[in-house]
């Protein structure tokens, strides 16, 4: 399952929509909730990012992300 993780690069400042970034993770999970938990843990263990939101991408949404050219899987 591919998850899109929205985050701020620092926890020192309050989140601002203009500085929100995203990364994509391929997570082996039994269901959506398990995938969100694993994605959050993976990001928090490997970065200092402030995770805002984690979303499971549908096939259509994933195709759109690939078409826009911003899609790149992140590996830790």
From Swiss-Prot:
InterPro entries: RpoY. It catalyses: RNA(n) + a ribonucleoside 5'-triphosphate = RNA(n+1) + diphosphate. Pfam families: RpoY. GO terms for cellular component: DNA-directed RNA polymerase complex. GO terms for biological process: DNA-templated transcription. Keywords: DNA-directed RNA polymerase, Nucleotidyltransferase, Transcription, Transferase. Its EC number is 2.7.7.6. GO terms for molecular function: DNA binding; DNA-directed RNA polymerase activity. Belongs to the RNA polymerase subunit epsilon family. RNAP is composed of a core of 2 alpha, a beta and a beta' subunit. The core is associated with a delta subunit, and at least one of epsilon or omega. When a sigma factor is associated with the core the holoenzyme is formed, which can initiate transcription. A non-essential component of RNA polymerase (RNAP). This is DNA-directed RNA polymerase subunit epsilon. It comes from Streptococcus pyogenes serotype M6 (strain ATCC BAA-946 / MGAS10394).
């Amino acid at each position: 399952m591919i998850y899109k993780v929205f985050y701020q690069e620092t926890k020192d400042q309050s989140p601002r929509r203009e500085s929100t970034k995203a990364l994509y993770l391929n997570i082996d999970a039994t269901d959506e909730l398990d995938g969100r938990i694993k994605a959050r843990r993976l990001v928090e263990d490997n970065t200092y990012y402030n995770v805002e939101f984690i979303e499971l991408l549908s096939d259509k949404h994933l195709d759109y992300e690939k078409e826009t050219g911003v899609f790149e899987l992140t590996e830790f």
